[in-house]
Curated annotation (Swiss-Prot):
<dbReference type="InterPro" id="IPR029066">
    <property type="entry name" value="PLP-binding_barrel"/>
</dbReference>
<comment type="function">
    <text>Catalyzes the interconversion of L-alanine and D-alanine. May also act on other amino acids.</text>
</comment>
<comment type="similarity">
    <text>Belongs to the alanine racemase family.</text>
</comment>
<dbReference type="GO" id="GO:0030632">
    <property type="term" value="P:D-alanine biosynthetic process"/>
</dbReference>
<keyword id="KW-0663">Pyridoxal phosphate</keyword>
<feature type="active site" description="Proton acceptor; specific for D-alanine">
    <location>
        <position position="34"/>
    </location>
</feature>
<feature type="binding site">
    <location>
        <position position="127"/>
    </location>
    <ligand>
        <name>substrate</name>
    </ligand>
</feature>
<dbReference type="InterPro" id="IPR000821">
    <property type="entry name" value="Ala_racemase"/>
</dbReference>
<dbReference type="GO" id="GO:0005829">
    <property type="term" value="C:cytosol"/>
</dbReference>
<dbReference type="InterPro" id="IPR020622">
    <property type="entry name" value="Ala_racemase_pyridoxalP-BS"/>
</dbReference>
<protein>
    <recommendedName>
        <fullName>Alanine racemase</fullName>
        <ecNumber>5.1.1.1</ecNumber>
    </recommendedName>
</protein>
<comment type="pathway">
    <text>Amino-acid biosynthesis; D-alanine biosynthesis; D-alanine from L-alanine: step 1/1.</text>
</comment>
<dbReference type="InterPro" id="IPR011079">
    <property type="entry name" value="Ala_racemase_C"/>
</dbReference>
<dbReference type="Pfam" id="PF00842">
    <property type="entry name" value="Ala_racemase_C"/>
</dbReference>
<feature type="binding site">
    <location>
        <position position="291"/>
    </location>
    <ligand>
        <name>substrate</name>
    </ligand>
</feature>
<feature type="modified residue" description="N6-(pyridoxal phosphate)lysine">
    <location>
        <position position="34"/>
    </location>
</feature>
<dbReference type="InterPro" id="IPR001608">
    <property type="entry name" value="Ala_racemase_N"/>
</dbReference>
């Protein structure tokens, strides 16, 4: 029996896939499962997505694409990692294709490799991609790659429909489309597609955080973080606990310890702010979160071996990644991907 684990909800994942499909029925999703499926464990998530009809996947690195093929994926797009010439037969066999993210690939000879490519155009993110204004380079890339060019894509810096940046970036992307070959897969939007107007020329989109339950009404968080109480004691009035005694008891207080800390990805900035769930309802986190342990104030009927919900929902309460993120000044993406791989992921 584990003393800490993360649960991946197959029902919530299914709900999210269905909602995304209902919202964007004319676009085929390319599921983004980078960074180990946003910390959910790609080995757990990818087979479930396949069961729900998702057949296309995207990751950042080629090594992750090779791993995904072991989980059953047969169409994988590498977003930002150059191919290796001695791996082309393996890429082809495993259905791996690559985004062209730098015009230098032309001079490096990478575009002559016998694999499929998507042209990644920088229209304003200014992070990676061939700049939209390098029209001669774009034409040359299309010519060299020829029928191995499978798609054209970009990444928006702001996907909200009322954004001036969106209007500017979409106009730039349209300019590139006007000089690109016809019949390509076209994808430039991510989970923000659920909010903004559909792009009439798009054939696909790349949902990421929405698959995992965040960013749009009706989505359900997929990952819960749980642990068992490993120690309990009564803290007397006037006594503090943990490093620096940042919390001090004003009355006899039942304290329980769980074996999760910032080494597991439970942020230290949650100290004296977080809540958790138990059979007795809400628990208040007290004292400084340490590397491997965290303490909570709890009713006396919460005892060693009891399950504590550190992230998730319970009867009468919830504390999800977006709520954690708000407390520590970050985004749910970072909360989810920070959970250490040493915490087992379990499909439920």
């Amino acid at each position: 029996m584990w003393n800490k684990w993360a649960e991946v909800s197959r029902m919530n994942l299914k709900n999210n896939v269905e909602l995304i499909r209902q919202k964007l029925p004319d676009l085929e999703p390319i599921a983004v499962v980078k960074d180990d499926a946003y910390g959910h464990d790609a080995a757990v998530v990818v087979p479930e997505l396949l069961k729900n009809g998702i057949t296309k996947f995207a990751v950042v690195y080629a090594k992750d694409a090779l791993m995904l093929s072991e989980f059953g994926a047969e169409w994988i797009l590498v977003l930002d990692d150059p191919p290796l010439s001695n791996m082309c037969s393996e890429y082809e066999k495993r259905g791996i294709r690559f985004c062209i993210t730098d015009s230098k690939w032309l001079s490096d000879g990478l575009l002559e490799l016998p694999i499929k490519f998507h042209l990644f155009v920088d229209v304003g993110m200014h992070r990676e991609g061939v700049p939209w204004y390098e029209t001669n380079t774009i034409r040359e890339i299309c010519k060299v790659v020829g029928n191995r060019l499978e798609g054209i894509c970009s990444h928006l810096s702001n996907g909200l429909s009322d954004s001036q940046a969106l209007a500017t970036e979409e106009e730039r992307f349209r300019e590139v489309l006007s000089i690109a070959p016809e019949g390509l897969m076209v994808h430039l939007s991510n989970s923000a597609s659920l909010y903004n107007a559909k792009f009439p020329y798009a054939t696909h989109f790349r949902p990421g955080i929405s698959l995992y339950g965040y960013g749009y009404p009706g989505l359900k968080p997929v990952l819960s973080l749980k642990a068992r109480v490993i120690h309990e004691h009564i803290l007397e009035p006037g006594e503090g606990l943990s490093y620096g005694w940042t919390w001090r008891a004003t009355e006899p207080t039942h304290v329980v310890t769980v074996p999760v800390g910032y080494g597991d990805g439970y942020n230290r900035k949650l100290s004296n702010k977080a809540i958790a769930g138990s059979k007795a309802g809400n628990l208040q986190q007290i004292g400084t979160v340490t590397m491997d342990f965290t303490m909570f104030e709890a009713p006396k009927n919460v005892t060693v071996g009891d399950e504590i919900v550190l992230m998730g929902e319970w009867e009468g309460g919830h504390f999800w990644a977006d709520e954690m993120a708000q407390l520590v000044g970050t985004i749910p993406y970072e909360v989810l991907t920070s959970i250490n791989p040493r915490v087992p992921r379990v499909l439920v």
